Every structure is written in structure tokens, then in C-alpha cells.
UniProtKB/Swiss-Prot annotation:
A single GO molecular function term of this UniProt record: ATP binding
Assigned keywords, A-Z: ATP-binding, Chloroplast, Nucleotide-binding, Plastid, Transit peptide
Superkingdom of the source species: Eukaryota
Similarity-based family: Belongs to the RuBisCO activase family.
Described purpose of this protein according to its UniProt entry: Activation of RuBisCO (ribulose-1,5-bisphosphate carboxylase/oxygenase; EC 4.1.1.39) involves the ATP-dependent carboxylation of the epsilon-amino group of lysine leading to a carbamate structure.
Binding residues annotated for ATP, in chain numbering: 162-169
InterPro entries tied to this protein: ATPase_AAA_core, P-loop_NTPase, RCA-like, RuBisCO_activase_AAA_helical
Protein name: Ribulose bisphosphate carboxylase/oxygenase activase, chloroplastic
Subcellular localization, as worded in the UniProt entry: Plastid, Chloroplast stroma
Transit peptide region: 1-54
GO cellular component assignments: chloroplast stroma
Amino acid sequence: MAATVSTIGAVNRTTLNNSNYGGLVPNSAFLGSRLKVSSRFTTSKMVTGNFKIVAEQDEEKQTEKDKWRGLAFDTSDDQQDITRGKGLADPLFQAPMGTGTHNAVLSSYEYISAGLRDYSYDNNVDGFYIAPAFMDKLTVHIVKNFLTLPNIKVPLILGVWGGKGQGKSFQCELVFAKMGINPIMMSAGELESGNAGEPAKLIRQRYREAADIIKKGKMCCLFINDLDAGAGRLGGTTQYTVNNQMVNATLMNIADNPTNVQLPGMYNKEENPRVPIIVTGNDFSTLYAPLIRDGRMDKFYWAPTREDRIGICTGIFRTDGVPFEDIVKLVDTFPGQSIDFFGALRARVYDDEVRKWAVGVGVERIGRNLVNSKESPPTFDQPKMTIEKLLEYGNMLVMEQENVKRVKLVTSI
């Protein structure tokens, strides 16, 4: 049997299954400043058995006195601790949890992106319309950033701005699909965080991820939706935070040094590929003025013409069998409406079918049939869309818009 010495610094050993090999385990103990070792080998045979050494574990002796023990979990107001605020803010305003951006002890390269967008549709087959001017601007900007032009400084950022609901983001996605580009996506909600500096770090991470895709031989770009909503200043009711400043400063720095984008705390001399940045917004005058200067950002104002509106609406109603003449009449009847208006108009036509189904099932049994049913969800026959019905629902939408502008319940008190 292996002897056990219960002294300070002792190692406790478990008993071997075969007691014949007990002499093979040496005995040692610290006695003051001297070390006594007694070892006696009774046989010279090779031993193939397994034995286990078990030490008594006392976590309090180590963790309570360790000054670094709370590095990844401290909720103090220390700028080094980037985990402050984790789980306390709405996830819309933070990067995805568990991806490395909230844990101070992880390497930045352990970040796994949730922003890579994969488009599975082909706009040529599905019949979507791309405005020629829009496609020309995006194509030229992207190609210029992948070329090496002599003595030419090409703006890295393309800012597409215009009225609300005019299809800026969707037109960009169609151009990306046409060119075979899977962009790295960001939105305005990711440009603010409870942790100072995290959105700026996220921009650099997404940019370097797009650069890695380009390095592997596939075109890519960084696509930021509604930049002015996240980094702009919209009147006196909007608070300008440190993150707003750092987002603007980071984009300016990347635009000036597009091939030398480093992550915080990780610096090397290896250059990364240049990545075009496409941003959308409604009003770029709310952004920091040096960011939108011509050397850094190329601006493109998107205001669809009548031909563009007809072409886009043809794509919206492509599966409904609406004649081209009716689409032209519909566009001309509502000339001041956005592109999104016609998508909402098409959705309104299904209201009658949904109402019939709800009445037939019974209001009290709707939940049982929609979310707690073994049967498949209900399907509807495609309603016939006539120009009369479209004009009727279109006028209803216009009346609702005018009613909101006219009543103004908050300001009328």
C-alpha cells in the first residue's frame, strides 16, 4: 500500500488496484526545510498499470487573494473592462453575445461574424428591376476601389442618401447579387453600445473580416445601413456620445488608411486588402462634416425617376398578373409616394382574404390554429388585383397619411 503523509505540502495518493506494485511509488514529505525521500524498488519488471494522483482542492486559498480574478466579470466603471453592461442593454444596441466582443479575456480574432449576408436569389430570373443610374454608380465605385489607378486617390466610402422608403438598401442588395458579392452587413443599431469604444472596434472587425474574404479571392464589401441614424445628430433631442465620436473617427481613419486597419491591441505590418464601404442614409448633413468630404466619401443622391418607379413597381407586382398599363396608371396616380408605398399597397390587398379566414376559424381559436397546431399554417389563394381595387386601397393609405399629419395629437394639447 502506498503510504500517505499528512503534513504541510504533502501529496495524497490513491491506493493502486494491484497492491504488489505499492513499492514503486516513492514517499516524500517536506519536514521543515529538509526533504526526506525514501524509495525502494522491489522488482525490475515493466508495469503497465495506471494510477492517479489526487490533490486536495481549496479554491478560496487561490481565488480570493488573486487580484486578477474578476477581470472578465467585474462591473466597475473601469475602461479596461469591456464587459461592463453585458446583458443590461437591449441586444439591438450590442453586438451578438458570445462572439468575443463582450469578453475582455478573448482575442479579437475569435470574433465570429453574424453580419455576412448570403443572397440566394438571382435578380435576372426573379425579374427585379435595378435602376441603371444606381447600378452604374455602385459598380463604378466598387471597381475603382479594387483597381490600382496611377496617382488617383479614390474615395473608400460611397454614401447613398435620399428620401425614406425609396428602396436604397434593396437596390444595393440587387447590385451586390448581380455582381456576386456577399457583403458584410452592419446596421445603425450596432453603432451604439453600453461599452465605450465597442462600436468602433466592431467596425474594424467587420472591415478586417471583409478583407479576409477578399484575400481568399472573393469580392466583398462593408455595407452599413442607416448610418445617419446611428452616428448622426438629429436635433437637440439626440445625445451625442463618445461612441458617436469614435464611430466617425474610425470611419475617417479607415478611409485615410484603408490597407492598414488594425484591431485594438493587435498590431502588425502586414497590409490588408482594400474593402469598399457602402453606407445608406436619409440626411448626411447630420454626420460629422470631415467624414463626408469628397476625398473620403463619394455621395450619391437617389431619387427614382418615373421610369425607375414604373420598373420597380413592375417587379413588385410581377407575380400578380397586373397589366403594364395598370402599373403605369397606378404610378401616375400616386406620384408623390415612395416605392415602399406600393409594397404596402400590395400587402393591403390580402386583408380581405385574411379577414375571411379569421371569421371562418373564430377569433377565440386563432392562436390554436396559428402557433399551436399540428397542421400546417393556412394558405391563401392569390387574390385578383384589379386596378380599381389597387386605387381604392391606395386612396385609403393616402387618407391615413393625411390624417396623421392633420391631427397631431401631441402638439394640439
